[in-house]
């Protein structure tokens, strides 16, 4: 007896003497013969194409055939890398970036001539440092920024970031708080920079402690009982200009023959919040950062602050900048990411505009890698993520025009901002076990890739479905392990539990917890 099988096929391209092209002009007739593609033809389709010049791995069904993509389209258009915990996301990201900057099995192919790649990684769990540290003889300079050496003075924040940091949006006096805080910041910027042409968002120096003094004086203020306007200090001095007087120190006010000032008692919680923030040792990197010589940052240090993010650190040019956010307190994570993202975008925007004047395009394109993206650019509209979402969504919508692309990495793609995911042109999907995430990713992908998506929950570690503008065909690819590897190994609980009892130096843990210096 003859065994009959029904095979459901999806036409995806046409192969002729001129080679393979995506898309089908003339559909085959029902009675025409069908053949399976042999290995030689697959090799021709995937490897014999000059446009597809960047290897990302090997075809999962035949590991003798290289999986090639268009490198320009891969990195110049936003990429989403998604997959459940343990599927191999960190290794895939590390391998892609190692190939992009010229790593070859732990060696630096470009050590004789520095190349022009600029990649910034938001590293939430301190995983990627290991993946980009080579021996000194390979001459690869990794630019590692963390809470101890990050130069990020608070006066670079814009209005939204400042208010996220210092003002409770649900406080009944939040309107007055914003109004007076804004006025004080602008006035202090004018004083500190001797320039009246500044606004709330101008990235120039101001003194947050002086702003706090101003607000506390408003909160204490007593005014003349007769005119009900003029503040009177305890020594009888009449205050003619609040800004000129109140920045310098906190004053006592005359109690007799005076009334409460217009904001008396209204800012008590606000001032307490400011004091709490300013005294928090964990926030020193942001609220009281110091240069190497121990002095504070000023407006004319802006160039050095900017250069750290794109790899221009003194003479140590760096293709990879890792921003290790593992030590950043969660309550300011969104603000920190927003500030850095916005600085990088504004640089790319203004550099591109300068190039456009002379008819050129941006010649130092930058990729921003958002690891664990669901933690700070979520789909939800919670106020604590407002600033980071706004900054990165702007990059997603406008960045490519100015030479700034995104790589969005997440184990929960269904929880990432839809605005950002919808702007991704290339998808690398590793094993996904959550049905919501599977459905979400399927809805983002083209309709014509058919049942290949059904493989998502059963992919092996390091295997990924590759779809997008950079690929010749939707394919399941096996990525090779990066060398060196990121530090993302799972702790072996049972093995550790079976070891002998370990003592803990609790003092060191607590010092680290409090961000004190450990010895």
Protein language model regions, located:
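Glycine-rich phosphate-binding loop of nucleotide-binding enzymes
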Residues: 55-145, 418, 466, 497-498
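Short loop/turn elements that form and flank the Walker-type P-loop nucleotide-binding site
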Residues: 75-76, 114-116, 316-317, 361-364, ...
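Hydrophobic residues in beta-strands of the RecA-like P-loop NTPase core, especially within AAA+ ATPase
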Residues: 122, 370, 409-410
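Conserved ATP-driven motor cores of ASCE-family P-loop NTPases powering translocation/secretion/packaging/pilus
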Residues: 168, 393-478
């Amino acid at each position: 007896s003859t065994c009959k099988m029904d095979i459901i096929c999806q036409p995806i391209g046409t192969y002729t003497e001129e080679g393979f092209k995506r898309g089908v002009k003339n559909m085959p007739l029902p009675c025409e013969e069908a053949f399976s593609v042999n290995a030689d033809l697959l090799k021709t389709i995937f490897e014999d194409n000059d446009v597809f010049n960047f290897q990302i791995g090997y075809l999962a069904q035949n590991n003798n055939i290289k999986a090639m993509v268009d490198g320009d389209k891969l990195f110049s258009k936003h990429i989403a890398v998604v997959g459940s915990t343990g599927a191999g996301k960190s290794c895939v990201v590390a391998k892609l970036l190692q190939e992009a900057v010229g790593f070859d099995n732990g060696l630096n192919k470009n050590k004789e001539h520095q190349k022009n790649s600029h990649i910034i990684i938001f590293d939430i769990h301190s995983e990627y440092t290991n993946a980009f540290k080579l021996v000194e003889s390979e001459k690869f300079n990794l630019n590692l920024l963390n809470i101890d050496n990050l130069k990020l003075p608070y006066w670079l924040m814009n209005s939204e970031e400042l208010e996220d940091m210092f003002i409770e949006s649900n406080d009944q006096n939040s309107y007055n708080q914003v109004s007076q805080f804004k006025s004080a910041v602008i006035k202090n910027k004018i004083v500190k920079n001797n320039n009246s042409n500044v606004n709330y968002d101008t990235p120039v120096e101001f003194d947050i402690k002086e702003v706090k003094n101003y607000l506390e004086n408003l909160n204490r203020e007593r005014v003349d009982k007769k005119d009900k306007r003029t503040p009177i200090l305890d020594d009888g001095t009449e205050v003619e200009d609040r800004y000129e007087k109140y920045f310098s120190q906190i004053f006592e006010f005359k109690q007799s023959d005076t009334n409460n000032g217009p904001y008396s008692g209204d800012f008590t919680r606000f001032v307490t919040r400011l004091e709490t923030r300013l005294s928090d040792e964990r926030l020193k990197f942001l609220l009281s950062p110091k240069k190497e010589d121990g002095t504070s940052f000023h407006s004319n240090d802006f160039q050095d602050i900017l250069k750290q993010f794109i790899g221009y650190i003194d003479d140590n040019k760096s293709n990879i900048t890792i921003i290790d956010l593992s030590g950043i307190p969660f309550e300011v994570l969104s603000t920190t990411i927003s500030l850095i993202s916005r600085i990088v975008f504004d640089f790319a925007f203004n550099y591109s505009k300068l190039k456009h004047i002379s008819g050129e395009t941006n010649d130092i394109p930058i990729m921003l890698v958002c690891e664990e993206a669901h933690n700070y650019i979520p789909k939800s509209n919670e106020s604590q993520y407002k600033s980071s979402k706004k900054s990165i969504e702007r990059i997603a919508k406008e960045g490519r025009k100015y030479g700034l692309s995104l790589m969005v990495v997440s184990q929960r793609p269904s929880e990432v901002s839809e605005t950002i995911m919808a702007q991704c042109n290339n998808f690398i999907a590793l094993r996904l076990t959550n049905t919501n995430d599977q459905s979400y990713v399927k809805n983002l992908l083209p309709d014509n890739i058919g049942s290949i998506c059904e493989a998502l929950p059963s992919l092996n570690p390091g295997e990924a479905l590759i779809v997008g503008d950079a690929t010749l065909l939707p394919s399941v690819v096996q990525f090779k392990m990066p060398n060196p590897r990121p530090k993302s190994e799972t702790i072996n609980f049972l093995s550790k539990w079976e070891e002998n009892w370990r003592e803990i130096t609790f003092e060191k843990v607590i010092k680290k917890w409090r961000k004190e210096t450990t010895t």
